[in-house]
Design a protein with these regions (language model features):
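Transmembrane alpha-helical segments of multi-pass small-molecule transport proteins
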Residues: 104, 131-160, 176-182, 363-381, ...
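Extracellular loop-to-transmembrane helix junctions
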Residues: 49-74, 97-99, 401
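Flexible loop linkers connecting adjacent transmembrane helices
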Residues: 6-14, 46-51, 74-99, 124-134, ...
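Juxtamembrane transmembrane-helix boundary signature
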Residues: 34, 61-92, 103-117
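Hydrophobic, small-residue-rich membrane helices and short re-entrant helix-turn-helix hairpins
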Residues: 45-51, 166-169, 215, 237-273, ...
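Hydrophobic transmembrane alpha-helices that form the core helical bundles
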Residues: 100-135, 336-355, 389-390, 442
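Selective recognition of specific alpha-helical transmembrane segments in multi-pass small-molecule
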Residues: 60-75, 184, 234, 260-288
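Hydrophobic alpha-helical segments and their helix-loop junctions in multi-pass secondary transporters
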Residues: 176-214, 226, 232-243, 409-420, ...
Length: 454
């Protein structure tokens, strides 16, 4: 009997016995899966570089989108759990196939780019863990290919053969580790009272002026960084997929209230806290330190020049000293891993639902497992073709995410007010938040498009 117990005990069960880890076990669920997936390379890049480049000026964006995310995702959860239908099936049958394809096609293309950016972050993180940068130009060769293949195989194997519940638990554990790293640095930065004054100023909505990248002819755009933060917070694929996740996790109508509070815990508190502390860490440990007259690392002496993972890893310097770049690089591997899996899971739901196939993640659903693996493997293996620093790739992917966000929010607003939801239809307060979210996203998209032609 003792032997049997030892054999069947899962790694998650062992972790749950460690101090503090068990306290967070109750957070596991689709909200934790989504939160962990949203604390990926895109989240780190958009917020850390916002803090590094613009100080606290963009803190308001990261903070104000939190309630938008919570209410939008909880509304999507209601729709999925009560109807038991996939979002794309509902769009096809209740509105029209034309709209389903209008959303699906660009979502597919954007998420190929997102997954490429996540694998690039993992590869650059792997090199950064050894204190180097990936080879570029003519130096790119077999070594880069081997690292990419190994990381791709490890990610696909862990995701596909672990099962849905195991994926949830892996995501939750990684979520907590990544969050803890940044909290330490942010707390140290907040010990200076002047930091609080600057932080307060960052709560006032503003678009900081563009800054010139020292030593080059390039600039960093404050508005583009706003688009990137909002695009990472309101990705249409995550918003539309949340109902699938809630249904797949076994939620029932009676679980909706408890599920709402889990969403508040995971997205409102943990992910929201992450968003704030990463900007605080970037502002205090990078923006205030790399001023051009201070330290130099990999040839970078000014905050405007920061764009590679090892240099950005200096953000953990106040807590970890010389180990900071290596530890940060390992964290980026974990962050890229979570989002790569989360996005692949989301797109597998969408593809199977569009094809009218079973979209539930079970060990018996072989088409799901095959497509899930392909969504990890194909973008990951072609990632080296795109030659940009990984953090800049992530920012570009997040900006692309925002384009369909207004449509996704409006669809959720439509379905959460349908008579089929009965007593769980949205009330005035929820509709107000969803309406503000749609207008906020639409305003950013319109201004972004206008900026391209003016």
């Amino acid at each position: 009997m003792a032997t049997a117990l030892t054999v069947t005990r899962s790694p998650a069960a062992v972790l749950a016995r460690l101090p503090l880890v068990g306290v967070f076990a109750r957070l596991v669920g689709p909200a934790a899966l989504t939160a962990a997936g949203m604390i990926g390379a895109g989240a780190v890049a958009t917020r850390l570089l916002a803090g590094a480049w613009f100080g606290f000026d963009l803190l308001w964006v990261a903070l104000y989108v939190v309630p938008m995310v919570v209410f939008t995702l909880d509304s999507a959860s209601r729709v999925g759990v009560i109807t038991g239908r996939g979002m794309f099936e509902m769009i096809r049958s209740d509105i029209g196939a034309w709209l389903a394809w209008f959303i699906f096609a660009p979502t597919l293309l954007v998420n190929v780019i997102v997954n490429m950016s996540q694998m690039s972050a993992m590869v650059e993180g792997a090199y950064g863990a050894f204190g180097t940068l990936p080879p570029v130009g003519a130096d790119r060769g077999a070594g880069l290919v081997v690292v990419t293949v190994v990381l791709t195989a490890a990610t696909a194997g862990a995701a596909v053969f672990g099962g849905y519940k195991r994926v949830e638990k892996i995501m939750t554990a990684l979520l907590l580790v990544i969050l803890a790293c940044f909290i330490v640095v942010a707390i140290k930065g907040l010990l200076d009272w002047q930091t609080w004054v600057a932080l307060g100023g960052g709560l006032v909505p503003q678009i900081p002026p563009d800054i010139a990248v020292v030593g080059t002819g390039r600039t960093r755009s404050g508005f583009m960084q706003v688009l990137a933060i909002a695009g990472q917070a309101l990705p249409p694929s995550v918003l539309l997929a949340y109902g699938y996740l809630a249904t797949n996790s076994g939620q029932r109508v009676g679980d909706l209230k408890a599920a709402y509070w889990k969403t508040v815990q995971n997205l409102g508190v943990i992910w929201g806290l992450f968003s704030v502390v990463v900007i605080v860490a970037g502002a205090t440990a990078l923006h205030a330190v790399y001023t051009g007259s201070g330290p130099t690392y990999f040839g970078v002496s000014h905050y405007s020049q920061i764009e590679s993972i090892p240099v950005a890893g200096q953000v953990l310097g106040p807590a970890l000293g010389f180990l900071a770049p290596r530890f940060f690089s390992l964290g980026l591997i974990a962050a890229g891993f979570t989002t790569l899996i989360s996005v692949s899971l989301t797109m597998t739901y969408f593809c199977l639902d569009m094809a009218g196939r079973d979209w539930r993640f079970t060990r018996e659903n072989r088409p799901f497992q095959l497509l899930f693996a392909l969504w990890i493997v194909v973008p990951a293996l072609i990632a080296p073709i795109w030659q940009l620093p990984a953090l800049l790739k992530a920012i570009i992917a997040m900006i692309g995410n925002l384009v369909l966000a207004p449509v996704a929010v409006l669809l959720i607003l439509y379905f959460v007010n349908r008579p089929a939801l009965g007593e769980h239809r949205a009330g005035a307060g929820r509709n107000l938040v969803l309406g503000i979210t749609a207008l906020f996203a639409l305003g950013l998209v319109v201004n972004g498009i206008r900026g391209l032609f003016l």
